[in-house]
From Swiss-Prot:
Induction: By heat shock. Acts as an early heat shock protein, induced within, and reaches a maximum by, 5 to 15 minutes of the start of heat stress. Levels decrease over time. The gene is dnaK. Acts as a chaperone. On the 2D-gel the determined pI of this protein is: 4.7, its MW is: 70 kDa. Keywords: ATP-binding, Chaperone, Nucleotide-binding, Phosphoprotein, Stress response. Belongs to the heat shock protein 70 family. It comes from the Bacteria. This is Chaperone protein DnaK. GO terms for molecular function: ATP binding; ATP-dependent protein folding chaperone.
Length: 32
């Protein structure tokens, strides 16, 4: 079910990369 749901997969990956990394990526994208 999780594999069939793109949103769940996205959240899983987000949890794997962790908050600091996600924040850095978001900050980088925001700066660009």
């Amino acid at each position: 079910q999780a594999v069939m749901n793109p949103e769940n997969t996205f959240y899983s990956v987000k949890r794997i990369i962790n908050e600091p990394t996600a924040a850095s990526l978001a900050y980088g994208f925001d700066k660009k």
